[in-house]
Each structure stands twice: as C-alpha cells, then as structure tokens.
Regions:
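Interaction-mediating elements
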Residues: 1-125
C-alpha cells in the first residue's frame, strides 16, 4: 500500500524518473501521514497517441494518467491535497501542463496489500 501508477506519453530521462519517484513517495508519506517503505511506484512511458484524455486538444503537449491504489479511509482533503501536489510536481518535472493530467483513486482494505515479508493490514508510521 499504496501503488501509484504513472502513465505518460513521452520519454523521460532517468534522472527525471528518479525525481518523480522521490517526490511522489515523499509527498504521499507526508500527506497521508505514513512511512515510505511500503510505497510502490510504476512509471510507464507511451508514444504520443497511446494515451488519450478528452480535455486535451493537442496530445503533443503531453498526457499523464495517474492511478493510485490506496488504503480505504483517506479523507477527501488528503486525496485532494495529494492530487494537487502530484500534478504540480509532475508538471514541473515533465513540462506537461496540469490540464493534461488525470488522477484516479481506487480504495482497498489493508489486507489487500502485501510486501515480501509481511501483510500490510495493520501499519504504523
């Protein structure tokens, strides 16, 4: 918990991917008041026309689709704060405008999350 999937329709430099992972994990940890050792992040790069977002009229300016699987019970305020901070940071790193970004949250019970050495049904900061 959580798994944050970032789909983007451009190629990223390795340093940009590292910055994204660092920022996403730190932001999630701060906003959700949790540790970082259980955060999973996937970055998937696609060619320009392999991602679509209806409000984007020119896909060459970029599209970012973010799917966040997280534990049930987070407040709307936490979710809004996370969305805003992630979009702003991703825009700064990728130069894709926030209007080209879309965030989806999927909630799970704690027992749905597992690391190699433990279930994450009961966690502590």
């Amino acid at each position: 918990m959580p798994h944050i999937q970032i789909d983007i329709n451009k190629d990223l430099k390795q340093d940009d991917k590292k910055m994204i992972c660092k920022h996403v994990s730190e932001t999630f940890s701060t906003v959700m008041k949790t540790g970082k050792d259980h955060i999973a992040i996937s970055i998937r790069e696609f060619s320009e026309h392999n991602l679509y977002l209806g409000q984007v009229t020119d896909s060459s300016s970029g599209v970012v689709l973010i799917n966040i699987d997280l534990r049930a019970g987070r407040t709307n305020q936490q979710r809004d704060q996370l969305r805003i901070q992630l979009m702003e940071a991703l825009s700064q790193i990728t130069l894709i405008p926030v209007e080209g970004m879309y965030v989806t949250y999927t909630e799970h019970q704690g027992e749905d999350f597992h690391l190699s050495n433990r279930k994450l049904d009961n966690w502590r900061l």
